[in-house]
Amino acid sequence: MPYFPAVDKVRYEGPDSDSPLAFRHYDADKLILGKPMREHLRMAACYWHTFVWPGADMFGVGTFKRPWQGSGDPLELAIGKAETAFEFFSKLGIDYYSFHDTDVAPEGSSLKEYRNNFAQMIDQLERHQEQTGIKLLWGTANCFSNPRFAAGAASNPDPEVFAYAATQVFSAMNATQRLKGANYVLWGGREGYETLLNTDLRQEREQLGRFMRMVVEHKHKIGFKGDLLIEPKPQEPTKHQYDYDSATVFGFLQQYGLEKEIKVNIEANHATLAGHSFHHEIATAVSLGIFGSIDANRGDPQNGWDTDQFPNSVEEMTLATYEILKAGGFTNGGYNFDSKVRRQSLDEVDLFHGHVAAMDVLALALERAAAMVQNDKLQQFKDQRYAGWQQPFGKSLLAGEFSLESLAKHAFDKDLNPQAVSGRQELLEGVVNRFIYF
């Protein structure tokens, strides 16, 4: 029996449509830069916010009344939840989904129960994928919610907790491989500290490094062809998390020789919590060669926490998509909606309203970003601004042909007196606005 009987399949109706259950800009097969929109964006709906979150917050219990969140046999409820999820994905017309292990299967009271429940639910997910054509963008393991992970998973002071987390990741990686997932994500929700008074930073970093090496080894052992992705976040739930931002993750990966093995999954709201723009985090990851995928959402600038609202800024998403297109587009990654309806959005149709509007935002941003790439005035200005480094003197500097002493002698001999030139920020901001708001 359908859970959303009043909702038909969402279709493209064009910019003049007034329907909140129709796309105004997302025309899945429309060609942009020679490739369909759906292939550029690779959009996914997440299992956890859409079907697991009960509408609770730290001040109140859940406000949603979802049938699968009631009482009953946990496995039967999980099976019903999966049926509802794929009904939603299909009617929404989204191509991908994402999950944590315990989103889709009851955790049980032991590792054996966990393994058996998860195995049965992977059978269910595989069947639904075959029937609907919906694909898995990425899988992951929830190694942060259970009280055993209060002090972390890989960074936990108890090696048995480390082993338990490794077992979950082992299972979730194997499930992702079986379901033909495009990526596997590692979010260190509690890989950090609350206070330095009881924390050995060197010890915990070594544990994290060992854990990630094991993950990489297992990827190659099972022949997983997708990307491994760390998801940076500066804090929350811990006071300080070790995967603070893209640059921090890169330093960690370099330390353990993993910079060619693991990339990043960048979340917009995590970027702003770290004091960065979403644009900054993407550009940084691209420049370091570790860009992988995106969690699309937004935070509230007046709140200092992770609100996970649906993206609604065409400007922000245009600049993000511009950087992604300039880098060659997604390889295995995509735009995963790590977004949730608000606690007062009680009706089932609200799930559609949030996703439809956000998918339209990304589609419009893609069109604007493609126009920027085709007439790349920003790159033209950058080429001009850095032109000196393409001249013989600039090239010799980067090639290491000068020591500090010989370079100082060169400056004295040439009586160098370089002058500042305009960075043209206001001009370039106007250029971007003309592309977005034409």
Curated annotation (Swiss-Prot):
Gene Ontology CC: cytoplasm
UniProtKB keywords: Carbohydrate metabolism, Cytoplasm, Isomerase, Magnesium, Metal-binding, Xylose metabolism
Cofactor: Mg(2+)
Enzyme class: isomerase
EC number in record: 5.3.1.5
Source organism, top-level taxon: Bacteria
Residues at the active site: H100, D103
Positions of Mg(2+) 2 binding: E267, H270, D306, D308
Positions of Mg(2+) 1 binding: E231, E267, D295, D338
Main location as per UniProt: cytoplasm
Catalytically driven reaction(s): alpha-D-xylose = alpha-D-xylulofuranose
Entries under InterPro entries matching the protein: Xyl_isomerase-like_sf, Xylose_isom_bac, Xylose_isomerase
GO BP terms, alphabetized: D-xylose metabolic process
A GO MF label: xylose isomerase activity
Localization per record: Cytoplasm
Cofactor note: Binds 2 magnesium ions per subunit.
Family of the protein in this entry: Belongs to the xylose isomerase family.
Subunit structure: Homotetramer.
Protein name, as recorded: Xylose isomerase
Species whose genome carries this gene: Pseudomonas savastanoi pv. phaseolicola (strain 1448A / Race 6) (Pseudomonas syringae pv. phaseolicola (strain 1448A / Race 6))
